Amino acid sequence: MATPEKNLWNRLKTKLPKGTHKTRVENRAGTGVPDVHLCVAKTAFWVELKCTKGDTVSIRPSQIAWNMQYSAAGGISFFLVSRVKPPCLFLFDGGEALRLATDGLGSGSLAAAAWAGDDLATCVSFMIDRASSWAR
């Protein structure tokens, strides 16, 4: 049976533009490296996939450290969070990892979400545009 993150990955793949180079990282070492590496239109970035049943987002300390250090070094990364009920998608910049882990979706961190909604295609388009603008 597929995990919720695997299902989110399968949905995400169908919404990526043609020609996207995509790599799903199956990392069991706990180093904090995000789940997915994407390269679209000469822009490379990382995406950590998270699924939650409520407002709490479970993020390991190694994931927080990796994303915050990567962001501080000028790297581009995101957290794509899928909440089951009520259903909604949230996109956070990787540099917001600590705040997301601490505050979750419902304790003020929502204001820090770069994007929120229920349409994955729109989320993907926003994520690519945001990554491209940072890469310039």
Give residue spans per PLM region.
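Beta-rich catalytic cores
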Residues: G32
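Nucleic-acid nuclease catalytic cores
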Residues: S71-A97
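Active-site-adjacent loop/helix micro-motif of nuclease/hydrolase catalytic cores
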Residues: K53-I64
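Acidic-basic catalytic patches of nuclease active cores, encompassing PD-(D/E)XK
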Residues: M1-N27, A135-R136
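Charged phosphate-binding loop/patch that engages nucleotide di/tri-phosphates or the phosphate backbone
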Residues: G108-R136
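Sequence/structural signature of beta-propeller domains
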Residues: V57-S58, F92-D103
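Conserved catalytic cores of phosphodiester-cleaving nucleases, focusing on short active-site segments
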Residues: V36-L38, K42-K53
